[in-house]
From Swiss-Prot:
Pathway(s) the chain acts in: One-carbon metabolism; tetrahydrofolate interconversion
Protein role: Catalyzes the oxidation of 5,10-methylenetetrahydrofolate to 5,10-methenyltetrahydrofolate and then the hydrolysis of 5,10-methenyltetrahydrofolate to 10-formyltetrahydrofolate.
A GO cellular component entry from the record: cytosol
Catalytic activity: (6R)-5,10-methylene-5,6,7,8-tetrahydrofolate + NADP(+) = (6R)-5,10-methenyltetrahydrofolate + NADPH; (6R)-5,10-methenyltetrahydrofolate + H2O = (6R)-10-formyltetrahydrofolate + H(+)
Organism expressing this protein natively: Methylobacillus flagellatus (strain ATCC 51484 / DSM 6875 / VKM B-1610 / KT)
Name of this chain's protein: Bifunctional protein FolD
Entries under PANTHER family matching the protein: C-1-TETRAHYDROFOLATE SYNTHASE, CYTOPLASMIC, C-1-TETRAHYDROFOLATE SYNTHASE, CYTOPLASMIC-RELATED
Classification via SUPFAM superfamilies: Aminoacid dehydrogenase-like, N-terminal domain, NAD(P)-binding Rossmann-fold domains
Lineage of the organism: Bacteria, Pseudomonadati, Pseudomonadota, Betaproteobacteria, Nitrosomonadales
BP terms from Gene Ontology: L-histidine biosynthetic process; methionine biosynthetic process; purine nucleotide biosynthetic process; tetrahydrofolate interconversion
Length: 289
C-alpha cells in the first residue's frame, strides 16, 4: 500500500478562492470587505515568513490587511493598549498577534485581551468553550484546517477512532474537540501516556502535534489509517520534517499529509475564513455580551 497524499496546498487554494468569492459577492451588494489587523513583534525569521504568508492571503481574498510591525522591545502595556484600541475600532474585524512573543510578554494575557469576537486565531477561552459545547463560531485555525483536510478524503469520520498526540492549548486540545464534533472517538496522548505505540496502532486517524521529529514511527501506523502531521521541525542539515516518520508511514496509511505542504497552508486559509466570519457575526449581532 502507498498512501494517497493529502495536498494541503491545493485544498487551501480552493478555500481561499471560496472566501474570495464570498467577499466579492459582499462587495457587489455594497457591503464592505473584512479587515484583519496583524501584529508582529520583532524580526524572528519564521514569524516574519508566517506573517508575510498571512498578508499575501489577505491580498488574494480581498481582505484588507493592517500591518503593525513593532520592535521586540515593545512593552506588554504598549501591546495591550494597541489591542484595546483595535478592539474598539468597528472597522477592524479580526486581530492577530503573531507568536511566539518576547519573553517579557505574557501570552495568556494577550489572548484574553483580544475581543472574543475579533479572535480570528480561535485561541480565546470563549471561542474554545463554544467549540466544547458544540456551538463553534471562530474556530482554532489549525484544527479547523485539519478537519477540512480529513473531509477532503471523502472518508466518513463518524465513529472512527482518532488519536491526537499533543495537548497544547492552541492545537492539541482544540483538535480533540474538533474530532469529537465530527463524531470520532477521541484519545489524547501526551508525555504521561504509558504506551503511545499501542494507542497509535489502533487509530483510524492519527494527528501528530508535538514538534518532535519522527517521534511517531512509521511501523506504528495501522494499515489504512489517515495520518495528519501538524509538526514541522528543522533538522541539522536544514531540511524540514514532521513528527511522523513519513517514508515508512506512507507505506501503511491510506492517506497522509506531507511536511511541508500539508497542514500549514490550511492554517492560513482558515484564518481568512475566520476573518470573514468575524465580520458576518458582528453584522448579525451574534457577539458575546
Amino acid at each position: 500500500m502507498t498512501a494517497q497524499i493529502i495536498n494541503g496546498k491545493a485544498i487551501a487554494e480552493a478555500t481561499l478562492s471560496e472566501t474570495k468569492s464570498l467577499i466579492d459577492k459582499r462587495l457587489e451588494k455594497g457591503l464592505r470587505a473584512p479587515t484583519l489587523a496583524v501584529i508582529l513583534l520583532g524580526s524572528d525569521p519564521a514569524s516574519t515568513i508566517y506573517v508575510r504568508n498571512k498578508r499575501l492571503a489577505c491580498d488574494k481574498t480581498g481582505i484588507r490587511s493592517l500591518a503593525y510591525d513593532l520592535p521586540d522591545t515593545t512593552s506588554e502595556a504598549e501591546l495591550l493598549a494597541l489591542i484595546k484600541q483595535l478592539n474598539q475600532d468597528d472597522a477592524v474585524d479580526g486581530i492577530l498577534v503573531q507568536s511566539p512573543l518576547p519573553a517579557h510578554i505574557e501570552e495568556k494575557k494577550i489572548i484574553e485581551t483580544i475581543s472574543a469576537t475579533k479572535d480570528v486565531d480561535g485561541f480565546h477561552p470563549y471561542n474554545i468553550g463554544r467549540l466544547a459545547v458544540r456551538q463553534p463560531t471562530l474556530r482554532s485555525c489549525t484544527p479547523y484546517g485539519v478537519i477540512k483536510l480529513l473531509q477532503s478524503t471523502g472518508v466518513r469520520l463518524l465513529g472512527l477512532d482518532a488519536v491526537v498526540v499533543g495537548v497544547s492549548n492552541h492545537v492539541g486540545r482544540p483538535m480533540a474537540l474538533e474530532l469529537l464534533l465530527a463524531g470520532c472517538t477521541v484519545t489524547s496522548c501526551h508525555r504521561h501516556t504509558k504506551d503511545l505505540q499501542a494507542s497509535i496502532a489502533r487509530a483510524d486517524i492519527v494527528v501528530a502535534a508535538v514538534g518532535k521529529p519522527h517521534l511517531i514511527k512509521g511501523e506504528w501506523i495501522k494499515p489504512g489509517a489517515i495520518v495528519i502531521d501538524i509538526g514541522i521541525n528543522r533538522l541539522a542539515d536544514g531540511s524540514l520534517c514532521g513528527d511522523v516518520e513519513f517514508d515508512i508511514a506512507k507505506t501503511r496509511a491510506a492517506w497522509i499529509t506531507p511536511v511541508p505542504g500539508g497542514v500549514g497552508p490550511m492554517t492560513v486559509a482558515t484564518l481568512m475564513q475566520n476573518t470573514l466570519t468575524a465580520l458576518e457575526l458582528g453584522e448579525s449581532d451574534q457577539a458575546p455580551a
